[in-house]
């Protein structure tokens, strides 16, 4: 058994998450974690809501509520959505916990002591009309690197590069469209140049990374500059330095603190299970690999910023230094970044109404239909497009007509003819029977190898190819025509049931909800595919502060079945089956497109009205 760390990108708590988000960080990470657990490995899968920084302030200002109120609301919304999607976190928490603040400040202080954090000045944007500092994400303009419009003051989504507001061309305020002025202010900086040699050397040892990820990551080191890790903002983690700790308008930069969340969540998980040092097996043991799942817009922070923070904390940059009490921290084994998903040919945008939220699609369609579509058509290594027509087609042709129908046919034939799993009669067995069982057993290595190499689309395609071959076997053997030969009929149906069971194991990481139903359709009892749960907890360091976490019980041999062919048992009662998957009516496509157009129009009108009101206020 090996320890496997699965770190999942932290969604901003500034609104509900949409399908484009979970296609990048959510479902792929869960498929991988579920597979590794079935392999017998000890997986720790962590994440949480990212609740500091300007995205929260921007939305809170729009709604006229405090940043904490907004974070509290969307922490609950997001946690429920991700739990409903079946994402099997060991701990999904948040960045406003006392535990997270302590861990972040510990890393800052050690990096400062080691000489990798220093004080300097930086230009900040000021609103001419109010005199207020405008945080990074309140500023938009043209990217100086790729020329894309709509780049933010902290990052360009088009090219993925990190930016400072004063680097933007033609910068304007998102609040009211005015042009900001820039003034020098004091900040702390992370000395990335002093860490670049060690960071790049580590990157060049990486094997098996997606080509786009490793090439982009290495390209970040063509020109490395120090980055400010504090901001003129009143919402965030206090800077743990005398003269700064009590300053209400100086906080740590959200991206310095957010990536530390993987470590702080692991520590919180260990504290909550009553073994405060248990996290070290995943972070201090150099043989333990850590896999980071995200969208491609977060590559910079996981292949440069977070590794640099760890190198600085470990004292492994050009200035040397001591390892902090939490270290030495393991560098990432792999950064698994997906490309972007669009919707009906348009870029996802909540503000513009180009969106389908997780909670909405799960309210109208089965969860595994959603997971299946994300897995089969998601942006694994190239951009992909969510279309309602393809969503319905994949569900109807592949889940309902192929896989679901196969399960029902086999279970129904067994129930009607035997009422239980029939025996496999060697005397009546044929090469055709043995070939099918050999194929399904061999598929574990093939499908598993593809998942391990983060080629989940191919893995799912291979599993569904096996499903197709089982269907062909049923058609070729025609069990409904051999009822007068009980021994042969029993052997065919035993073979089919074993093959279906094997296919269910192969599909379980992708389709955990229906995998449980298939298990029960073949007479299985107990938990086959464990699902996560929400728990309301109290903060470990801030009495009275409560919030929901996602957690679960995922134990091999108890709630997790192995990544292997488990022999079915003759004599197991098989009940009358019920449909596993239902077809979605074809007219749903037009209904969804009409809903999409109506919501798009309404959101555009609302945003235009808001901007007009802001402009009128400014001019008045």
Swiss-Prot record:
Its EC number is 6.1.1.10. One of its GO terms (molecular function) is ATP binding. Gene3D superfamilies: HUPs, Isoleucyl-tRNA Synthetase, Domain 1, Methionyl-tRNA synthetase, Zn-domain. It is an enzyme of class 6 (ligase). Its cofactor is Zn(2+). One of its GO terms (cellular component) is cytosol. A motif ('HIGH' region) lies at residues 11-21. GO terms for biological process: methionyl-tRNA aminoacylation. Binds 1 zinc ion per subunit. Zn(2+) binds at residues 143, 146, 156, 159. Its main location: cytoplasm. A motif ('KMSKS' region) lies at residues 347-351. It is found in: Cytoplasm. Belongs to the class-I aminoacyl-tRNA synthetase family. MetG type 1 subfamily. Is required not only for elongation of protein synthesis but also for the initiation of all mRNA translation through initiator tRNA(fMet) aminoacylation. This is Methionine--tRNA ligase. It comes from Bifidobacterium adolescentis (strain ATCC 15703 / DSM 20083 / NCTC 11814 / E194a). The gene is metG.
